[in-house]
Curated annotation (Swiss-Prot):
CDD domains: Maf
Enzyme Commission numbers on file: 3.6.1.-
Cofactor(s) listed in the protein's UniProt record: a divalent metal cation
Cellular compartments annotated: Cytoplasm
Free-text function comment from the UniProt entry: Nucleoside triphosphate pyrophosphatase that hydrolyzes 7-methyl-GTP (m(7)GTP). May have a dual role in cell division arrest and in preventing the incorporation of modified nucleotides into cellular nucleic acids.
Species annotation: Vibrio cholerae serotype O1 (strain ATCC 39315 / El Tor Inaba N16961)
Gene3D superfamilies reported for this sequence: 3.90.950.10
UniProt keyword annotations, A-Z: Cytoplasm, Hydrolase, Nucleotide metabolism
InterPro entries found in the cross-reference section: ITPase-like_fam, Maf-like
Name listed for the protein in its UniProt record: 7-methyl-GTP pyrophosphatase
Length: 193
């Protein structure tokens, strides 16, 4: 097994915290790629394309294994982005009230030695409880989820917004599906345990 530098193609502190759970040394790099969706592109295709483009844009040394990841949430077949403002966050939460929304997380692992990329898309469904406007406002004021797809942080107080969760890996909901990442790393000969 070659000694690869592990690179996380993300500046997200949430993804960094998740990856740190694996107890593997890694560095981070800011990806440089156009995130504009293509006309008619499905969420799955968009996220796999973006994850791969991010990973391929960030290798820092030879040899490197570069992790790229991207995420969106979808409600009623519409991609919901990061709210960026308090009003937009409250609006998103009220739209999601009583609904099931699906999170799509694209994951890519690029080996710069072989130029091969493993790419996949993981899904996770969140069932929201019925929310009043005052509940949504109190939550947004308390946690400021303005840079989070779906306007919540499931790893914090956001858990109070849900009736139930459906998915294989709760880390996927935060933006980095570790169970699947471990499989991709092992495919490259890097064993986590």
């Amino acid at each position: 097994m070659q000694n690869y530098q592990l690179v996380l193609a993300s500046t997200s502190p949430f993804r960094q915290q998740i990856l740190a759970k694996l107890k593997l040394p890694f560095v981070t790099a800011k990806p440089d790629c156009d995130e504009t969706p293509l006309i008619g592109e499905t969420p799955e295709h968009l996220l796999m394309r973006l994850a791969e483009n991010k990973a391929r844009s960030c290798f820092l040394a030879d040899p490197s294994l570069v992790i790229g990841s991207d995420q969106v949430c979808v409600i009623d077949d519409q991609i919901i982005g990061k709210p960026l403002t308090t009003e937009k966050a409250v609006e998103q939460l009220l739209r999601q009230s009583g609904q099931a929304i699906t999170f799509y997380t694209g994951l890519a692992l690029f080996n710069n030695q072989t130029q091969q990329t493993q790419v996949l898309c993981d899904t996770f469904t969140v069932h929201f409880r019925t929310l009043s406007e005052s509940m949504a406002r109190r939550y947004v004021e308390a946690e400021q989820p303005l840079h989070c797809a779906g306007s919540f942080k499931s790893e914090g107080l956001g858990i109070a917004l849900f009736e139930r969760l459906e998915g294989d890996d709760p880390n996927s909901l935060i933006g980095l599906p570790l169970i699947k990442l471990i499989q991709l790393l092992e495919n490259e000969g890097l064993n986590v345990i």
